[in-house]
Amino acid sequence: MAGSTAEQHGDGPLVGVLALQGDVREHVRVLQGFGARTRLVRQPKDLPGISGLVIPGGESTVMDKLSRQFGIAGPLRSAIDDGLPVYGTCAGLIMLADEIVDAIHDQRSIGGLDVSVRRNAFGSQTASFEVDLDVPALGDPPVHAVFIRAPVVASVGPAASALASLDDGRVVAVRQGALLGTSFHPEVTGDLRFHRLFLDMVEDAGRTL
């Protein structure tokens, strides 16, 4: 898969998965399970025709460098500004955030989502954890969430809304129009309601690049 942008054929919307680094395969599998067609996106030429995009978890600093190296960062921001639905998980949330409060030297985000995030807010890989989250927008039961070297939303701007928070009040899921972000990894738990929500957002947007 790493060397191909091949699409799955079907009747569902064509959803891209940013395939620079991270858990790309898991998101492709989930999206195809819902009947969506998928395309791996690495370069600007991969954007035309998609109706939505998932930015997977991984390492945000590496994604940032590669997105600039492959020339996709600027065109993707333009697509976001034009209303492309995008869902970012973990590092993908960092990439969508307008501000990274603890960015390393020269680290940038693509932006578009009116939030500030803090990287690795819960510690190292060994500090990963699981928790059940109340997500009113998704109803019952609670969402079982896995946090792996996860970011946290440090502040939510007026354009965005919090969808879920931990018991201590820290925000871990947000939405702003056609943009969706989670600190955790729904693709690894089997609770796929956030992906279903995103595909509903894609359908509601009714657009392609």
Curated annotation (Swiss-Prot):
Belongs to the glutaminase PdxT/SNO family. The active site is at C90, H185, E187. L-glutamine binds at G58, E59, S60, R119, I148, R149. NCBIfam families: PLP_synth_Pdx2. InterPro entries: Class_I_gatase-like (IPR029062), PdxT/SNO (IPR002161), PdxT/SNO_CS (IPR021196). One of its GO terms (cellular component) is glutaminase complex. Its EC number is 4.3.3.6, 3.5.1.2. Keywords: Glutamine amidotransferase, Hydrolase, Lyase, Pyridoxal phosphate. This is Pyridoxal 5'-phosphate synthase subunit PdxT. Pathway: Cofactor biosynthesis; pyridoxal 5'-phosphate biosynthesis. Catalyzes the hydrolysis of glutamine to glutamate and ammonia as part of the biosynthesis of pyridoxal 5'-phosphate. The resulting ammonia molecule is channeled to the active site of PdxS. It comes from Clavibacter michiganensis subsp. michiganensis (strain NCPPB 382). It catalyses: aldehydo-D-ribose 5-phosphate + D-glyceraldehyde 3-phosphate + L-glutamine = pyridoxal 5'-phosphate + L-glutamate + phosphate + 3 H2O + H(+); L-glutamine + H2O = L-glutamate + NH4(+). HAMAP family: PdxT. The gene is pdxT. CDD domains: GATase1_PB. In the presence of PdxS, forms a dodecamer of heterodimers. Only shows activity in the heterodimer. Gene3D superfamilies: 3.40.50.880. Transmembrane segments: none annotated. The keyword Hydrolase applies.
